């Protein structure tokens, strides 16, 4: 899987935010030994954890612990529980929450497919095109803040 290269070449104009999120969730769920170096897109994705803590009205870590990753069915049921809290989490907070869930479950047998499928189901279920568009623009801005592109290099 060439996640690092794909993530570093993120383009606001052409890349699907769903593909970027899918790759990020797969990257998160890899073991530390197999995970490629973090790319600038994934560094920006990590900042959504701050949004999850900031905007959720309650302890986001308690909510993350309630998300059951032991089986695919229980994981999907847990995601449905998240959808009932959409107004409290926001699209950014939901992305951060899923990152926190992976952090909590590190070392357990959590498959890439489970998280990738779960996040895609979640996106189809509660995020509309406007939410995803806002997420894509926010991600792009966070990348630009950390890794500004100097247009003068071409001269």
Swiss-Prot record:
GO terms for biological process: symbiont-mediated suppression of host cytoplasmic pattern recognition receptor signaling pathway via inhibition of TBK1 activity; symbiont-mediated suppression of host toll-like receptor signaling pathway; symbiont-mediated suppression of host type I interferon-mediated signaling pathway. Keywords: Early protein, Host-virus interaction, Inhibition of host innate immune response by virus, Inhibition of host interferon signaling pathway by virus, Inhibition of host TBK1 by virus, Inhibition of host TLR pathway by virus, Interferon antiviral system evasion, Viral immunoevasion. Induction: Expressed in the early phase of the viral replicative cycle. Prevents establishment of cellular antiviral state by blocking virus-induced phosphorylation and activation of interferon regulatory factors 3/IRF3 and 7/IRF7, transcription factors critical for the induction of interferons alpha and beta. This blockage is produced through the inhibition of host TBK1, by binding host TBK1 adapter proteins TBKBP1 and AZI2, thereby producing a strong inhibition of the phosphorylation and activation of IRF3 and IRF7. Also acts as an inhibitor of the cellular response to type I IFN by interacting with host STAT2. Interacts with host TANK, TBKBP1 and AZI2; these interactions prevent interferon production. Interacts with host STAT2. Transmembrane segments: none annotated. This is IFN signaling evasion protein OPG029. InterPro entries: Poxvirus_Bcl-2-like, Poxvirus_sf. Belongs to the orthopoxvirus OPG029 family. The lineage of its organism: Viruses, Varidnaviria, Bamfordvirae, Nucleocytoviricota, Pokkesviricetes. Pfam families: Poxv_Bcl-2-like (PF06227).
